[in-house]
Amino acid sequence: MAKISKFQDKQVEAILNDMIAVLEKHQAPVDLSLVVLGNMVTHLLNSSVGSQQRIVLAKVFSDALMNSVKNSK
């Protein structure tokens, strides 16, 4: 999603590949995959981000997602 990141591409790709493998293992269709990923994002925000920053971070995340989808080829 992000073009500039503080994380190494290798690390991001490794985690992404693991997550894709899990969804494929469960033969999750797109709608179920999106529900699961959305629940994961919600869990991360609620369990790891202070209440003052949750809405701000959720907005930044959703904006980045929208930009990624708009700019995909």
UniProtKB/Swiss-Prot annotation:
InterPro entries: UPF0352 (IPR009857), YejL_sf (IPR023202). It holds the Pfam family DUF1414. It comes from the Bacteria. NCBIfam families: PRK13689.1. Belongs to the UPF0352 family. This is UPF0352 protein HSM_0097. It comes from Histophilus somni (strain 2336).
